[in-house]
Amino acid sequence: MAQEKRGSRDDRQNREERDSEFVDKLVAINRVAKVVKGGRRFGFAALVVVGDQKGRVGFGHGKAREVPEAIRKATESAKRDLIFVPLRDGRTLHHDVNGRHGAGKVLLRSAKAGTGIIAGGPMRAVFETLGVHDVVAKSTGSSNPYNMVRATFDALKHQVHPKDIAAQRGLKYATLQARRAASGNASEE
């Protein structure tokens, strides 16, 4: 009975291939201090957003004494907590949605092809790693990057694919699409 070693080369290569599909963006880095008996001990905290640009995205927070280590920890944390967001035509959101975390509020609106990413700071990083090409976003309240990212994720978690809505209402997907086209909210093809 042959047992494979825990950290085998194949395992490492598979992990590297899996990690290579992700794009990561550094959103914020802070210098933090821990007060100890002899004075202050400085460290760094990093906020990173990771995504595959195909609808999966996550964010992570890492703290360490050195910047690269804090970024590495944040990236690993983000890869552990990925969410899937359904995209319309692989480029925008299906519907407008609000999100909130603490005092940070965001409004995300789907947009026509060619609009681009109209969003500020931390929200832009989320959309770029998610794979959204056309979106209009507005943030109000707190401008703290942590609150803005969490509020954006709150909004993205409320995105629902029209097929799921059709199933809940007991309708056919084609019927729902026809209603959407009739109301003028159809995607530009």
From Swiss-Prot:
Keywords: Ribonucleoprotein, Ribosomal protein, RNA-binding, rRNA-binding. The N-terminal domain interacts with the head of the 30S subunit; the C-terminal domain interacts with the body and contacts protein S4. The interaction surface between S4 and S5 is involved in control of translational fidelity. Belongs to the universal ribosomal protein uS5 family. One of its GO terms (cellular component) is small ribosomal subunit. The gene is rpsE. One of its GO terms (molecular function) is structural constituent of ribosome. Part of the 30S ribosomal subunit. Contacts proteins S4 and S8. Residues 22-85 form the S5 DRBM domain. With S4 and S12 plays an important role in translational accuracy. GO terms for biological process: translation. The keyword Cell membrane does not apply. NCBIfam families: rpsE_bact (TIGR01021). This is Small ribosomal subunit protein uS5.
